[in-house]
């Protein structure tokens, strides 16, 4: 670089703890770019994609989606983990760890894109910055297991040991001191999870196992929600007006997700 040479470095590959060459998984080139920018102490890392930047939602799904000029690391992490595919989650985590601003730009046309950085001007933030969705999950329910301390661990431990990642979890209490336990996993893991639950149900004296792979998870994200009440209520009312039933809900300080 000091000699004016522009190096072209391949992304998507790295080295594990044993020194073996390996790949970084989906979106690994983003992570490569961020790691190099951190090592070179760059002012920002620019990620060129097939979109103009980060939108309020997927513009291919909603023609009213708006380009965001700026979004915080925290919001981008929530959006990426909830289905937004514009930036790879690990790349955002790494940039946040070293406070390296990211700029998402289009490869096909000029523009300022979207700047992802530490939160600034919180008073000017919109309540909701973005909406993301995932339709690649399945919902599994184990019926009639005893409602006793530790039952959740007994259900989820074998799932975790099988390397299956669980997303949304809901536990319901019934009148006979039994509970229905529901959670979501990636569709590719649904059959394996179902087989594990069948064995768990027999061990716990539970009932039937139900699998539903025709679901979607919708999330709204925004740091402004911390200071504003009623966001969840408005979201639920909007879904109800459109006759969309909610089967699961999960929330954090800046994110509300529903499974429909």
Predicted regions and their residues:
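C-terminal catalytic "cap/lid" subdomain
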Residues: 1-260
């Amino acid at each position: 670089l000091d000699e004016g040479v522009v190096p072209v470095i391949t992304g998507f590959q790295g080295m594990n703890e044993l020194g073996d060459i390996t790949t970084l998984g989906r979106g690994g080139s983003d992570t490569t770019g961020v790691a190099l920018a951190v090592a070179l102490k760059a002012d920002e890392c620019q990620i060129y994609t097939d979109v103009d930047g980060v939108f309020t939602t997927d513009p291919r799904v909603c023609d009213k989606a708006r380009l965001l000029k700026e979004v915080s690391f925290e919001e981008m992490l929530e959006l990426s983990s909830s289905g937004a595919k514009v930036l790879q989650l690990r790349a955002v985590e790494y940039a946040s760890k070293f406070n390296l601003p990211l700029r998402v730009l289009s490869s096909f046309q000029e523009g300022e894109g979207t700047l992802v950085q530490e939160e600034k001007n919180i008073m000017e933030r919109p309540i909701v910055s973005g909406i993301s969705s995932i339709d690649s999950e399945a919902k599994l329910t184990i019926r009639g297991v005893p409602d006793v301390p530790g039952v959740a661990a007994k259900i989820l431990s074998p799932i975790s040991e099988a390397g299956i990642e669980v997303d949304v979890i809901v536990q319901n209490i019934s009148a006979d001191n039994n509970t229905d336990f529901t959670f979501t996993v990636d569709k590719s893991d649904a059959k394996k999870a179902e087989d594990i639950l069948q064995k768990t149900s027999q061990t716990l004296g539970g009932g039937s196992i139900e699998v539903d792979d025709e679901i979607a998870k919708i999330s709204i994200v925004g740091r402004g929600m911390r200071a504003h009440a009623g966001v969840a209520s408005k979201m639920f009312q909007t879904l109800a007006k459109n006759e969309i039933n909610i089967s699961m809900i999960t929330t954090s300080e800046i994110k509300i997700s529903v499974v429909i």
